[in-house]
Each structure stands twice: as C-alpha cells, then as structure tokens.
Amino acid sequence: MKLLTSLVFCSLLLGVCHGGFFSFVHEAFQGAGDMWRAYTDMKEANWKNSDKYFHARGNYDAAQRGPGGVWAAEKISDGREAFQEFFGRGHEDTIADQEANRHGRSGKDPNYYRPPGLPDKY
C-alpha cells in the first residue's frame, strides 16, 4: 500500500511540475469525467466491436484537457485493464485495449477504431 501511495504521489508531483497544482487537479477531474462519459456511451450504444473506439475516444477526450487529463486517463485505463485481466479476461484483448488507450491519449483520431454503422451520436 505504501508503494502504491508513493507511486500515485510521484505521478501527481511529476504532473504538477508541468503547470499549477490546481490546474492539474482540475484537468484530472475533467479527464476522469471524459472517461466516464465514454464508458456510459459504450454501454448505451451496446454496439458490436465498438469497445476499442470508446477506449480511444475516452482517452483522447481526457488528454485534450492537459497533463492532468492524460494522467487520469492513464491511471484509469491501466487500472481497468489490470482489474479485467486479473479476473480472467483475455491477455490479447487487454493488449488491444491498451493500444487503443495509447492511441487516444497520444492525440490520434479515435475514429480509427470506429466500427461501421455506429450512430453519429457517438
């Protein structure tokens, strides 16, 4: 637990060095909201083969907020994938999800993963 706390603190510290503390925290909260919106949209759409698109879109939207959004997207994505892999989800699917996450966080177009026919609402 001490190691995890130290890692989170160091990650926050590194992110804060890039800008003000309150700005970083604000961006992180907004980025977490972007990730949540992508998740709820994915559940609402219930569209076959859309998982990677929503991963990329959530990370992309969060990263557009700034360093705090990037940090939040990375921690949320890594945590979600670690949790799912721990409970037996396929390793190959986890790798593909992480690639979509990195794609979005790097600022690349999330529509690269958009499945055909997904309604324009998303």
From Swiss-Prot:
It is found in: Secreted. Keywords: Acute phase, HDL, Heparin-binding, Secreted, Signal. Residues 91-122 are annotated as: Disordered. Pfam families: SAA (PF00277). Induction: By bacterial lipopolysaccharide. PROSITE patterns: SAA. One of its GO terms (biological process) is response to bacterium. Disulfide bonds: none annotated. The keyword Methyltransferase does not apply. One of its GO terms (cellular component) is extracellular space. InterPro entries: Serum_amyloid_A, Synovial_Prolif_Regulator. Residues 91-108 have a biased composition (Basic and acidic residues). Residues 20-45 are annotated as: Important for amyloid formation. It comes from the Eukaryota. GO terms for molecular function: heparin binding. Major acute phase protein. Belongs to the SAA family. Homohexamer; dimer of trimers. Can form amyloid fibrils after partial proteolysis; the native, undenatured protein does not form amyloid fibrils (in vitro). Apolipoprotein of the HDL complex. Binds to heparin. This is Serum amyloid A-1 protein. It comes from Mus musculus. The gene is Saa1.
